[in-house]
From Swiss-Prot:
Function: PUMPS are mitochondrial transporter proteins that create proton leaks across the inner mitochondrial membrane, thus uncoupling oxidative phosphorylation. This leads to a decrease in the efficiency of oxidative phosphorylation and an increase in heat production. May be involved in protecting plant cells against oxidative stress damage. Recombinant PUMP4, reconstituted into liposomes, transports a wide range of dicarboxylic acids including malate, oxaloacetate and succinate as well as phosphate, sulfate and thiosulfate.
Organism (species): Arabidopsis thaliana (Mouse-ear cress)
GO cellular component, one term: mitochondrial inner membrane
Tissues/organs with expression: Expressed in roots, leaves, stems and flowers.
Protein name (record): Mitochondrial uncoupling protein 4
UniProt-recorded Gene Ontology molecular function terms: dicarboxylic acid transmembrane transporter activity
């Protein structure tokens, strides 16, 4: 069961991640919308996750207001200004991220779930499911953080002025450029946030899916089939979205920032709330739900089918 659970989770995660990539890109762009790009006022700050002796770097702040934009209009604008292919910017990083991060978290969750299940009743209570999700999500995020940073930057590149774009050729080029220009530690920029978010998402998503599915089956609402998998997975996606969105906004901004933009995650959160209001932490919530819902549905429906195919192995 050990290795097979990783294979099953990896296949399902890659399919789900790549098929919902455009929704994730729109979510990232919305989370960055309103963030200060540049101006003439220079402030000296240390980069996020900087070491104590790090030297400060200049950051250009802005006070200009930015009009609100919705996910549909943003998607249309991306297609008009950058072309339809832009909706798949960073998909190579998504592929790598799902291979590293999701394969690890999905496989490890199943391993822990099986290990912690009561041998007599054959059941696992909700608190242990959440614990398994927290552990699996944290380890998976630590493994996949370099691909996560590359993915965010590649997705966000099109919103920058032409002169400021990074123009990465692919995930390999993105990682090489970051290491060369910003050091190896840049690959783990925002890693504390990534790990926190992954722990929340994995615990909320996987534990709630199992809980919703068990509740539906035990109460005889539906049989164990496609309908049950879709309902349980969409509900799990909504729970994960509500729980993770604030951390996701800060994570996205820290990962995408130019050197010196924020003095760490807390500084990013404070500046975001101060400049844009508390609800800025739920920027991109609609596309988060619109992405997390389909992603979770595809993830678990695919996972259930892959399990059937690999049942005899």
């Amino acid at each position: 069961m050990g290795v097979k659970s990783f294979v099953e989770g990896g296949i399902a995660s890659v399919i789900a991640g790549c098929s919902t990539h455009p929704l994730d890109l729109i979510k990232v762009r919305l989370q960055l919308h309103g963030e200060a790009p540049s101006t003439t006022t220079v402030t000296l700050l240390r980069p996020a996750l900087a070491f104590p002796n790090s030297s400060p770097a200049a950051f250009l702040e802005t006070t200009s207001s930015v009009p609100k934009v919705g996910p549909i209009s943003l998607g249309i604008n991306i297609v008009k200004s950058e072309g339809a292919a832009a909706l798949f910017s960073g998909v190579s990083a998504t592929l790598l991220r799902q291979t590293l991060y999701s394969t690890t978290r999905m496989g490890l969750y199943e391993v822990l779930k099986n290990k912690w299940t009561d041998p007599e009743s054959g059941k696992l209570n909700l608190s242990r499911k959440i614990g398994a999700g927290l552990v699996a999500g944290g380890i998976g995020a630590a493994v996949g953080n370099p691909a996560d940073v590359a993915m965010v930057r590649m997705q966000a590149d099109g919103r920058l002025p032409l002169a400021q774009r990074r123009n990465y050729a692919g995930v390999g080029d993105a990682i090489r450029s970051m290491v060369k220009g910003e050091g190896v530690t840049s690959l783990w920029r925002g890693s504390a946030l990534t790990i926190n978010r992954a722990m929340i998402v994995t615990a909320a998503q996987l534990a709630s899916y199992d809980q919703f599915k068990e509740g539906i089956l035990e109460n005889g609402v539906m049989n164990d089939g496609l309908g049950t998998h879709v309902v349980a997975s969409f509900a799990a996606g909504f729970v994960a979205s509500v729980a993770s969105n604030p951390v996701d906004v800060i994570k996205t901004r820290v990962m995408n920032m130019k050197v010196g933009a924020y003095d760490g995650a807390w500084d990013c959160a404070v500046k975001t709330v101060k400049a844009e209001g508390a609800m800025a932490l739920y920027k991109g919530f609609v596309p988060t739900v619109c992405r997390q819902g389909p992603f979770t549905v595809v993830l678990f429906v695919t996972l259930e089918q892959v399990r059937k195919l690999l049942r005899d192995f």
